[in-house]
Amino acid sequence: MPLLLSGRGFRRELESAGCMAVHAPLEGGAETRLLRRLRAAGYRTHLTSARGLGDPEVFLFQKHGVRPPHLGHQSVGRGAAVGEVHDVMPLLGEVFLGDKPVVLWLLEGQVLSRSELLSLCDLCRREPRLKIVVEMGGARSLRWQPMTQLLAA
């Protein structure tokens, strides 16, 4: 049985564009197949959700503060006026340690605003080893296009 999707065309377009928008079938399977093909081609991959991303550059590359959930408890003068803040390590901190290129696959990318998507494209331009794939919704068959083309339309 021949392979239905070798991933070679997707990889070539991802390397040239840097940031891709993907519309994948809702039953799944196509994205994991592409991730497996990218890993076999020498990429490091990281799969995460776009929900709660905040400022993409800070969240991915810098140590940043996150407020824990409230859970209905009263703070009795323990924190500052803004409440407790926990320092969190960057999401892609350890992934960038080697020389391998990195693919960040963002699920549920349709929740991101236009400015957040543009900032992701700028990150790919500034960091040549970083490639970003954003799932922008479902489709009957797997299709992709550069993010700049999607945002220009």
Curated annotation (Swiss-Prot):
It is found in: Cellular thylakoid membrane. It catalyses: a plastoquinone + NADH + (n+1) H(+)(in) = a plastoquinol + NAD(+) + n H(+)(out); a plastoquinone + NADPH + (n+1) H(+)(in) = a plastoquinol + NADP(+) + n H(+)(out). It is an enzyme of class 7 (translocase). It comes from the Bacteria. Its EC number is 7.1.1.-. Keywords: Membrane, NAD, NADP, Plastoquinone, Quinone, Thylakoid, Translocase, Transport. GO terms for cellular component: plasma membrane-derived thylakoid membrane. Its main location: membrane. The keyword Transport applies. NDH-1 can be composed of about 15 different subunits; different subcomplexes with different compositions have been identified which probably have different functions. PANTHER family: NAD(P)H-QUINONE OXIDOREDUCTASE SUBUNIT N, CHLOROPLASTIC (PTHR35515:SF1). NDH-1 shuttles electrons from an unknown electron donor, via FMN and iron-sulfur (Fe-S) centers, to quinones in the respiratory and/or the photosynthetic chain. The immediate electron acceptor for the enzyme in this species is believed to be plastoquinone. Couples the redox reaction to proton translocation, and thus conserves the redox energy in a proton gradient. Cyanobacterial NDH-1 also plays a role in inorganic carbon-concentration. Belongs to the complex I NdhN subunit family. This is NAD(P)H-quinone oxidoreductase subunit N. The lineage of its organism: Bacteria, Bacillati, Cyanobacteriota, Cyanophyceae, Synechococcales. The gene is ndhN.
